[in-house]
A protein has these predicted regions:
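C-terminal substrate-binding/catalytic lobe of Rossmann-fold NAD(P)-dependent oxidoreductases
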Residues: 29-77
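Short secondary-structure transition/capping segments
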Residues: 12-16, 37, 63-75, 111-120, ...
Length: 139
């Protein structure tokens, strides 16, 4: 699954991921994304062993600890702000790219770690959505 870890990755990296591959074992998964500007971002989901939330951002000036669980205060503040203003804290484009990143990750796992472009995953997602809509309309 990994939505929270992927959201943290996107908070650091921003949009612009082009391709993804995912390596898996019985202990967990490592997903690697390549961004348009050449940066590489990784997400690791651990299924056996310590459940640690957070990460490390590597910059030209050094490394910085990121993420970590600080409670729900910040999330609730953003939810309240959204209900007051009607303006979502994250753009539609970023939200779609995050879900496309996860779709590409799953496709890569199904294909033994093959590199999947986000465009390929996006098109597959649209195709799958149209099938679901068609099936729902038949009921």
């Amino acid at each position: 699954y990994g939505i929270h870890g992927v959201e943290t990755l996107y908070t650091i990296m921003g949009t612009g991921c082009e391709s993804v591959n995912r390596m898996s074992s019985d202990r967990g998964d490592v997903v690697t994304g390549r961004w348009k500007d050449g940066r590489i971002g990784t997400f690791r989901g651990i299924t056996k062993g310590p459940q640690i939330y957070g990460g490390t951002a590597y910059t030209p000036k050094g490394s910085v600890a990121v993420g970590g669980y600080q409670g729900y205060k910040t999330l609730l503040e953003q939810i309240l702000k959204f209900f007051r203003t009607g303006i979502p804290p994250i753009s539609k484009e970023e939200t779609i790219e995050i879900f496309t990143f996860m779709k590409a990750s799953n496709m890569s796992k199904e294909q033994n770690g093959k590199i999947i472009t986000l465009e390929e995953a996006y098109q597959k997602g649209w195709k799958d959505a149209r099938k679901l809509i068609k099936a729902c309309n038949k009921k």
